[in-house]
Structure formats: C-alpha cells, structure tokens
Amino acid sequence: MDKALYEAGLEVRKATLGKEFVENAIASADDFNRPLQEFVTEYCWGACWTRPGLPRKTRSMLNLAMLTALNRPHELKMHLKGALTNGVTREEIREILLQTGVYCGVPAAVDAFRTAKEVFAELDKK
C-alpha cells in the first residue's frame, strides 16, 4: 500500500463523507473486508478524488449519476450526503436525477429520487 496515497484518500474521504462515518467503516472492517476498505481509500479516494482535473463538487455530481445508473441505493445515499457537503445543491441533485431518467431509465430515476427524499428528510430533522 502507498501510505501517502492512502492518507490523502483518507483525508478526502472524511471531508466528503464525514469523519464519523469513515472512522466507523474502517473500525468495523474485519480480516475479510479490510482489504476493500484500504483499496477504496487508497485508489478511489486517494488516486482518483485527489486528482487536479475536476473539483470535488463535479466528482460528486458524476458519482450521483453513475450510482443511479448502477442502481446502488446504499452507495447513492452516502454520496448524496457527500455531494451536499461538496457544495452540490438540492436543485442540482434534482436535475442530475432527472437527466438520469432520460439516459438510464425512469425506474432508476424514481428509485434515486426516493433515496434523495429520504436523505433530505433525514438531514432536515437535524
């Protein structure tokens, strides 16, 4: 493992998803899934998210579209929160999800809208 890349990824991951969430994910890792946590932190967050070509906001917007297309509601929920942290507005999220309906199918967009509404309601309670 590239320790510097891992640490850079850990910093971005915590800044986007929240320190508590990331620390819980790492702390709850066991011998089976710890390599995945390390891989995700080093490569997804370290090698990709730290690149200079796109700002975090744009990367978050891309992730919302891709996770909707892949029908991954658990990951979408997490990245919706991260997108808001990275400056994506609820209006921009709505537009992203509307566009996924055209290119990924209405059922994918319906599920993504449902997930977004759950996230917004959860955040509005705080």
Q: Where do the language-model regions lie?
A:
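A glycine-rich phosphate/pyrophosphate-binding beta-strand-loop-alpha-helix module
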Residues: 91-95, 111-114
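Short alpha-helical scaffolding segments that buttress acidic/His motifs in well-ordered protein cores
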Residues: 40-44, 61-68, 96-101
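Amphipathic alpha-helical interaction segments
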Residues: 47, 51, 69-76, 104-107
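Residues at alpha-helix boundaries and the short loops/turns that link adjacent helices
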Residues: 16-19, 73, 87, 103-106
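Mid-chain, well-packed structural core segment of small domains
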Residues: 61-64, 68-94
